[in-house]
A protein has these predicted regions:
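Non-heme di-metal
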Residues: 2-208
Length: 208
């Protein structure tokens, strides 16, 4: 398997969760129904802040030098994202870790962590796109433009991480472990979305 085939497989495996995590209800779940500028920014900040903490911890205990460098680089990008939120929302203070970060902190192994990161970045990019859409709707083009750049960073994360996988996956079994880790990460994000909306009395499934 090559990097693009891996990403395509993860997308196909998780088509429904990724689609729903890229819909407006996902942002509603992230903010627990509080759809105002400060709450949307705070939710985005929490995702970035806690992702940076997870990635920094991985960089510190990773034995593969190239993977450790990648984790450190991605952590720095996520810190930049959190600082972007702070510049837009002057009173921002980090809240509790999102469920997907709690899941990622249980993942062990270089192959598994890289696979999990692909899943995380695919879902995170969808989330950033929803933040863009929110601020477009709020007639805040500068903030929307800022989050378009954030979304683009997640596209880069997917590419860089899948390419890193190609250097550590030595067998089909390795690729399969990475694929399962990606799916489990998307599932963790999706289950939190589903449970949060149900608790808010909202149907998590699209109404046809």
């Amino acid at each position: 398997m090559d990097p693009q085939a891996f990403v395509d497989a993860v997308r196909e495996d998780n088509k429904t969760p990724l689609s729903r995590l890229g819909a407006s209800k996902a942002l509603y779940a992230d903010t627990e129904g509080e759809m105002d500028d400060e709450t949307v920014l705070a939710a985005a900040g929490d995702r970035a802040h806690h992702a940076a903490e997870t990635l920094s911890a991985w960089a510190d205990d990773e034995s593969d030098e190239a993977a450790a460098d990648l984790f450190a680089d991605l952590a720095e990008t996520e810190r930049d994202h959190a600082e972007t939120v702070a510049s837009e929302h002057g009173d921002y203070e980090p809240g509790d870790p999102p469920a997907v970060q709690a899941h990622l902190r249980t993942v062990e192994g270089t192959v598994e962590r890289l696979g999990a990161l692909v899943g995380w970045a695919l879902a995170a990019g969808n989330n950033a796109d929803q933040v863009v859409g929110y601020f477009v709707g709020q007639a805040s083009p500068m903030t929307a433009s800022t989050f378009r750049e954030v979304s683009g960073d997640y596209d880069d994360h997917v590419e860089e991480t899948s390419e890193a996988l190609a250097t550590v996956c030595e067998s089909d079994d390795d690729w399969e472990r990475a694929r399962e880790a990606a799916g489990a990460t998307i599932t963790a994000d999706y289950e939190d979305y589903f449970e949060t909306l149900e608790a808010l009395g909202v149907n998590p499934k699209p109404v046809c």
